[in-house]
């Protein structure tokens, strides 16, 4: 499973990149709104200068024609821009049109296997099921990952699964076990993955023994 960071903060992206594990970035309007010091397009340019992998940039339009035009403009920013489209009927039309233009798409706000299958058949490069938000309403977000992966494997679908709305390290482990191709997460979760109390204890013991 590859690691993406879910943020529009350039300092966080650089910090994750320096760890040597970052394969891409996902952003959304809420994350971009926190970055008041720079325009959306300028921030995307900054990100693509740091990260050579996929950088998802979300449209804010709700009808297909406007999504398509917005997606075309976003794709001009850099060759590694992936246009993020919400999972709606209008969104599916936009995904089909952009896919026909060889523009990569990431269909977001996926909450069912049927939605993921529709998005894949429309030509989505990625689908993003939201784990944490499903957990919040008492549903099993991780089981959804399993369902989508099984369907994609049975039908030989190349669309990649991005496990999104990751809240903690266990989400990452379980998503990887269930076949998600990618996990996108906040910087704090990436740091959580690197930590274990026994690792810290072992380092302390090694240093104590060395200094005796």
Curated annotation (Swiss-Prot):
InterPro entries: Aldolase_TIM, TAL/FSA, Transaldolase_3B, Transaldolase_3B/F6P_aldolase, Transaldolase_AS, TSA/FSA_arc/bac. One of its GO terms (biological process) is pentose-phosphate shunt. Its main location: cytoplasm. Its EC number is 2.2.1.2. Keywords: Cytoplasm, Pentose shunt, Schiff base, Transferase. One of its GO terms (molecular function) is transaldolase activity. The active site is at 84 (schiff-base intermediate with substrate). Pathway: Carbohydrate degradation; pentose phosphate pathway; D-glyceraldehyde 3-phosphate and beta-D-fructose 6-phosphate from D-ribose 5-phosphate and D-xylulose 5-phosphate (non-oxidative stage): step 2/3. It catalyses: D-sedoheptulose 7-phosphate + D-glyceraldehyde 3-phosphate = D-erythrose 4-phosphate + beta-D-fructose 6-phosphate. GO terms for cellular component: cytoplasm. It is found in: Cytoplasm. Belongs to the transaldolase family. Type 3B subfamily. Transaldolase is important for the balance of metabolites in the pentose-phosphate pathway. HAMAP family: Transaldolase_3b. This is Probable transaldolase. It comes from Bacillus velezensis (strain DSM 23117 / BGSC 10A6 / LMG 26770 / FZB42) (Bacillus amyloliquefaciens subsp. plantarum).
